[in-house]
Amino acid sequence: MLVDLIARKMREEGYTIVAMEGNLLPLPEDEKIPIPWKIRRHRPDVIGIGMKSRRVCIGEAKTHDDLFSRRTATQFGDFADIIGKSSGEKAELIVGVPLRSRDTLLQLLEKMKLHAEDISIILMPEELADDENEDHL
């Protein structure tokens, strides 16, 4: 569900989804969106392209526990390498987390010296996050 919210925000901001983990978008029967390609060592959940601006948007969903992992730190570091370098324009990063994880995410971004103007945050209400976790059990 969080990946869907990230994809929706991308579309609202004018990006066309070109790759998405799980292929959850409603598409005609014959069409599929490819899984995202790796950015350095990591594959994001969603990639969008601004067809007019040619900007890239990277979307990544994280659980609360993910925010404490070394993998998340290296992943954000890899993504940060292209923020500001996409076709001479700034690439955007959208991160989705459960509402309770907001402060933890902000602390991680600050520790990594990733600036808020390059990153959008989507906060998912706990009730929805709990439902999503139950679906994966």
Each model region followed by its residue ranges:
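Structural motif
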Residues: 21-23, 62-63, 97-100
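Acidic-and-aromatic substrate-binding clefts and catalytic sites of carbohydrate-active enzymes
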Residues: 38, 67-69, 99-101
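Active-site metal-binding core of divalent-cation-utilizing nuclease and nuclease-like domains
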Residues: 16-53
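Nuclease catalytic cores
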Residues: 1-11, 15, 19-22
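Conserved catalytic cores of phosphodiester-cleaving nucleases, focusing on short active-site segments
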Residues: 44-69, 79
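Well-ordered, non-membrane alpha-helical segments in soluble/globular domains
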Residues: 1-4, 70-80
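Domain-level recognition of nuclease-like catalytic cores that cleave nucleotide substrates
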Residues: 92-137
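Arginine/glycine-rich "motif VI" loop of SF2 helicases in the C-terminal RecA-like domain
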Residues: 80-90, 114
